[in-house]
Amino acid sequence: MTLEKTTRMNYLFDFYQSLLTAKQKSYMSLYYLDDFSLGEIADEYEVSRQAVYDNIKRTEAMLEQYEEKLLLFKKFKERKELLKKMRELVADSAQTEEAEALIESLEKLD
């Protein structure tokens, strides 16, 4: 699993965990946040590794569907990028008009 995918899943889990069942939250938390292996999670819950794998894959797909519809992570990244640009512009105070335009763009995201 790539670091990029892990980071994305961690963000999606943060944004959408309230929409998951207790079991889904637990499996995802153990797998992504606590870095448990499938076998360790299976032992903890007394189920097969395949059951854990299937649950995690289904939950990942659900998180991606939530993001596709709600776009919370996308908007978060856009806000983060706009804020970065704003900080750069504030450092160069000669470009206040561009800073105001970025602020307006940021306000429209919410």
From Swiss-Prot:
Family matches, as InterPro entries: RNA_pol_sigma_r3/r4-like, UPF0122, UPF0122_fam_protein, WH-like_DNA-bd_sf
Pfam families recorded: UPF0122
Annotated function: Might take part in the signal recognition particle (SRP) pathway. This is inferred from the conservation of its genetic proximity to ftsY/ffh. May be a regulatory protein.
NCBIfam families in alphabetical order: PRK00118.1-4 (NF001068), PRK00118.1-6 (NF001070), YlxM (NF045758)
PANTHER family in alphabetical order: UPF0122 PROTEIN CBO2450/CLC_2298, UPF0122 PROTEIN YLXM
Family designation: Belongs to the UPF0122 family.
Protein name (Swiss-Prot/TrEMBL): UPF0122 protein BPUM_1495
